[in-house]
Regions:
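Serine-dependent acyl-ester chemistry module
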Residues: 1-137, 142, 152-163
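Short, amphipathic alpha-helical "lid/cap" segments that border enzyme active or binding sites
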Residues: 11, 15, 171-182, 186
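Short, hydrophobic alpha-helical segments
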Residues: 26, 104, 181-191
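Conserved beta-strand scaffold positions in the cores of enzyme catalytic domains, especially
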Residues: 146-148
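Conserved PLP-binding active-site segment of the aspartate aminotransferase-like
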Residues: 161-172
């Protein structure tokens, strides 16, 4: 079974499990609060899926990497943008372009490509924008509450270091999240 097929099955299974969990909670008159998983977008993807990179562009990719080493982000930007467009399901191409866009202060473009890099990471070793999207879609379908922790952390990412390692946010952000969730629960329960 191919890596892509395995990931597709994993995502479908996750969607089914979340759907069943929310239905179970609602059937028992319980509140369900879905919380998106934080994703450290500064961590490179572990692997791109087979067949996602056109090898005829290898020279251009090597050129971009050399330009990054020389800190020539402006020249690297146009080449990396082309690579990300042509190899549009390649995690590494999106990651490199996202990092270059971030260096040039193009924050929205950087966020878009770094999220795509995480989504196209074939290793499935951490949370992914795909899981968060499934969670939000399923919560919306059942009219369940949804708290976007990932978006909250990304909003704070420009202000400093948010993550203490590849996966976990700093405790400060977890405390803020806990307080926000507690307030939401109080409103839901009308306390």
């Amino acid at each position: 079974i191919s890596t892509q097929k395995r990931n597709e099955i994993t995502f479908k299974l996750f969607e089914s499990e979340v759907d069943e969990l929310i239905t179970y909670a609602k059937d028992r008159n319980s509140y369900f609060l879905a919380i998106s998983a934080p994703i450290n977008l500064d961590v490179p993807p572990k692997s791109s899926c087979p067949g996602s990179f056109d090898e005829s562009f290898r020279t251009k990719l090597d050129n971009v990497i050399e330009l990054i080493k020389k800190k020539d982000y402006k020249l690297a930007y146009s080449i990396s943008k082309e690579l990300a467009l042509i190899n549009n399901s390649n995690a590494r191409s999106h990651f490199i372009h996202g990092k270059i866009a971030k260096k040039l202060g193009k924050d929205q473009e950087a966020l878009k490509h770094l999220e795509l890099a995480a989504a196209f990471d074939c290793d499935n070793w951490r949370s992914s924008p795909v899981y968060n999207s499934i969670l939000k879609k399923t919560a919306d379908k059942h009219d369940a509450a949804f708290f976007d922790l990932h978006a909250l952390l990304q909003d704070n990412a420009s202000k400093g270091v948010v993550f203490m390692d590849d996966i976990y946010p700093q405790n400060l952000y977890l405390e803020k999240t806990a307080n926000t969730i507690a307030d939401r629960i109080k409103k839901l329960l009308k306390l």
